[in-house]
Curated annotation (Swiss-Prot):
Binds 1 Mg(2+) ion per subunit. Its cofactor is Mg(2+). Catalyzes the conversion of glucosamine-6-phosphate to glucosamine-1-phosphate. Pfam families: PGM_PMM_I, PGM_PMM_II, PGM_PMM_III, PGM_PMM_IV. This is Phosphoglucosamine mutase. Activated by phosphorylation. One of its GO terms (biological process) is peptidoglycan biosynthetic process. The gene is glmM. It catalyses: alpha-D-glucosamine 1-phosphate = D-glucosamine 6-phosphate. The modification Phosphoserine is found at residue 101. The active site is at residue 101. PANTHER family: PHOSPHOGLUCOMUTASE (ALPHA-D-GLUCOSE-1,6-BISPHOSPHATE-DEPENDENT), PHOSPHOHEXOSE MUTASE.
Amino acid sequence: MQKKYFGTDGIRGKVGNSLINAEFMLKLGWAVGRVLANSHSATVLIGKDTRISGYMIESALQAGLSAAGVNIKLTGPMPTPAIAYLTHSVRADAGIVISASHNHYPDNGVKFFNKDGFKLSDELELAIEKQIDKPMKTVVADRLGKAARMNEAHGRYIEFCKSTFPSNLTLKGLKIVVDCANGAAYAVAPSIFHELGAEVVAIADDPDGFNINQTCGATDTAHLQEMVVKHNADVGIAFDGDGDRLIMVDHHGLRVDGDELLCIMAIDRFYLKENAPLGVVGTIMSNLGLEHTLKRHHIAFERSPVGDRYVLDLMQQKGWFLGGESSGHIVDLGFTTTGDGVITALQILRIMQQAEKPLADLKKVMVKHPQVLINVPIKGILDIAQNPNIKKAITEAEKQLNGAGRILLRPSGTEPVIRVMVEGSDEGIVRQTAEMLAAAVQQSTL
């Protein structure tokens, strides 16, 4: 059955438009409460990033949950993976994160975790949607849910993250620039690296409700790259607005993406023979260099659709524990149930310390194929497969690549854009082909 409200990662949109308004969030909270409170008194954890609209959404969800008889624990600004961890740790029935991830402040959304810290199943999302479409009824007064602040949330998550780093190692001797994206990681990430011994230079760590992901964070690393060089740092770390993805920067100021980080982690595990990966899951956007490198090391590789939810689904089907996306969502089931930027960073820093090598050397294990990604804004829905102009452009693009590359056009699941990706052996041809396809998509939207 097709879902009416839920997208690929919860519910997301422009604040005040569509579903991201107080009225719908009130009803959503009530619907979630109805599903959870069918058989027992339930408790839900609510966290958020730093967007100004988080206050409104948090209050509306809280009221709806209470009206359904559900108790609420409020953590305030916390990374998405922290809510996944804490939901299971405190034995809550569900966790809710108010965030639009890497998007700017006018957007917001809501995503959910079950009691075990995993994203909700399709069946549970459909059950919630069914309740949304029913008339809202408030429980009697003595059954209303109570809300309380969870003041220990930051400390518990900080200690959990530190526990994933070997107790016989420290980060002493490392200078790290940490870009918090003016988002949910600002209050925890710098402390974690500092407490493990690193010299920390924190940037984009002063959120004001409007500056989340604004010329900072995992999707815009230019300032971080400059700061790593300026401070003569060993490494730079960039999170996105909700802290579930990671991009790093080596000491030369060069960006290291999710494919490269995933490759470093997989090969490290393979040689350690400790929790050696049976295989690694990437996505249809993962660089061919990742696939080829892993296969040279006899590590199986499979591709899922884009989205950490789909990565995790395929990991679970295969019985593998490591997977991720080029964008920096990396899931390591040895430690957590969802992408966690801090824990991924700690694993890379561990490898650096144990190998006594800089990130610039570690990333040499993978040779990336030239790849160009262009996001083309659209209005409404564009049927890529049936559009004659786009079909003609794809045919021409395939001729240009001459069988030595990949072409992918797909609508984003989180933004009104068509993503055009071209990959091949010749960077000039790849860029020319991508620009030609992007122009065809743009022309088709006029």
